[in-house]
Amino acid sequence: MIDDTENSKIHLEGSHKTGKYTGYGTTHKIRAQLNFNDEKKWKKFSSRRLELIDSFGLSQHKASEQDDNIRQIATILRSEFEYPDTFSAEFEKLVTAAVQSVRRNRKRSKKKLLDSKKKIARGKVQKIPLSPPSSSNMGSCSASNASSSDEEASVKEEPAEHALPSLNTITSQKLLPYPNGRTLPPVPTQVRSLLKKNASLLRDPSAPYAHGGDEKLQKFDIEDQPLESEQEYDFIAKSIIVEIVNNAIPLPEQIQRDKFIRPNLTKKKGCQSKVVISNNLRKLILSKIHNSRTCLEMSKDERNLDSFANLETLGKNSLMASISLVVENSFSHLPSSTKQYLTERLSSIEFLTILSQRLFMPATRQLFADLSQEKIQVRVLNLILGSLVKDYGFDASLAPINEIIYHMTLHQYPLVCSNKQSNPMRPHSTSEVLSAHSSTKDASTPGKEEPRVTRSSTSADSTIITLPSIEVPNTYDDDRLKMLSAISLQIENSTFSKPFSTISK
């Protein structure tokens, strides 16, 4: 009987790779196969599994669409809990079941939240009186109460085909004595005529009154609520920028919170060095943000973020130019169609969201990965990047971004890496970027000139992405993006009468 009860609780989940799994039954079967009997250790395993799923953002896509990430997380868990390679398939099934469970739970919670909001909105609309304008000859207060009661009755008793019930039916069925024995006074003829007009307006809110055709019943639309959602998006994005600019989470703590450090994804020796490079580049970008005057002013400004639309455009165009440059310089050996496809993928909302998470998720205490991708995560990235370009110029701001984009491309598109030629174009190493940054700190000193769009590739303080043996005549060869970025920067700088003297808080 116990086995039958347990089997009845098993519910089917989606399939991934090897077939259909059952979340509850599969987990217990695999746990028995692994001899995972220690409850304390199992709870630790479950929490670590959810932590990795959240850090990699696996819950945003179907399990069948991210085999590599699932395999990587399974490898991490298997190595951390000291299981041999022979149990790789079992750990992959455990991760797959967890991903499917998290996706189901989030869908349910979102549906419940949406239903609750609809109920609240519906309740607000029902509380709004739908009576016509008051008249001096409407009768006594008791008669008004009777008319409102009559109106509610007509709304509730109206059939599906919206046929208007007769007034005699309403009066006979609804104007009955109350339970305590009190009776309502008879409804005056004038009130009945108003009730009839009101009921007809419920069927056609756009229809005018019989007397006074320009008077219409005011409509209350629930669809006005998305305006509040836009304000909420704006408030959340502003609060995240404030946390990042003011360094609400110290850098040492951010390193511990950094969800993108993946030491156990592979056994290759170069993995650790890549993590250090990414971490150093992120700290370099954060230090620029902390010392950026434009970022500070934006975080203190009480206006809506729409006031910084041109700054957001500057960041967006600069990021697109940076992506085009990385693809053109680092993967020039690929066919033209492949480069075009790679540029489109790197310019997608999904990739920009991952880039934004990689930079800013450890710097905020909010659930950054669960927020709206386009309206919050990518918008924060564009606003901050536009501020950095305005304060520091293109080269100093985008050089670390180019390096990060390059490594993310190799990680997400390993076939590109495997098909590379022996001497491909690629960005400077992290040490070169950091040394170049230290040599260009004087660019932010008082009295500096307005940042230019291009710099010579032969200058000593250049941080552009070049090959040692190949001269690159211009940092941004994409004329359209170059022109848009330059125009945005010129407009943004023209908002101040004098150039700022220092970049400090």
Swiss-Prot record:
Keywords: DNA-binding, Nucleus, Transcription, Transcription regulation
Keyword Nucleus found: yes
Positions of region (Disordered): 1-23, 105-179, 421-460
Low complexity compositional bias, start-end: 133-148
GO cellular component labels: cytoplasm; nucleus
Keyword DNA-binding on entry: yes
A Gene Ontology molecular function term of the record: DNA binding
Note: Present with 1730 molecules/cell in log phase SD medium.
Name assigned to this protein: Transcription factor VHR2
Species the sequence originates in: Saccharomyces cerevisiae (strain ATCC 204508 / S288c)
